[in-house]
Amino acid sequence: MLYEFKGLRPYVHEKAFVHPQANVTGNVEIYENVYIGPGAVLRGDWGKIVIEAGANVQENCVIHMFPGTTVMIEEGAHLGHGCIVHGASIGKNVLIGMNAVIMDDAQIGENSIIGALSFVKAEMVIPNRKVVAGNPAKIIKDVSDEMISWKTNGTELYQKLPNVCHTHLKKTTSLKSPKNQVNEEIISYTTWKKTN
């Protein structure tokens, strides 16, 4: 759902997908092939949010800021289920793990990976290609070329999802009884741990 706030209205590219159960308010720009999942809240009431092309904001993520701040989610960034980004900048092709929290004025360098449940403190600057994890978050190693390839392949699934949702997602009613259903499109993508 899109909401105007004091004359500020969201922009959503026609090739992006914002789930009807997401909440996008005010000064928010959402570009091509962006997926915004159900339960996501993007509050551009006090500042601005920019979601660049090919990024995704998954289910139950929250993006907000202190007044006058711009939150940048750069091209190809991947915000996992339930993460919170408050007044931070997320670089190109970054992966933010599920339920991670990224605080004000933190800067996440491109091709970095933030582990699930991590807490990135305010003003922390993470260089490009770093794996970060923990509470408080610490840099634990460099991101390999193989990790970047794995992350990029996963994000490509989400970059195709807006078109799929526009074409195939529709409200329905429950089946009267369970039946064996198979998605004809088998996707061979798995966790990093299982690939190594």
Where are each of the predicted segments found?
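A positional/architectural concept
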Residues: 7, 12-65
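Glycine-rich hexapeptide-repeat left-handed beta-helix
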Residues: 1-11, 45, 53, 59-61, ...
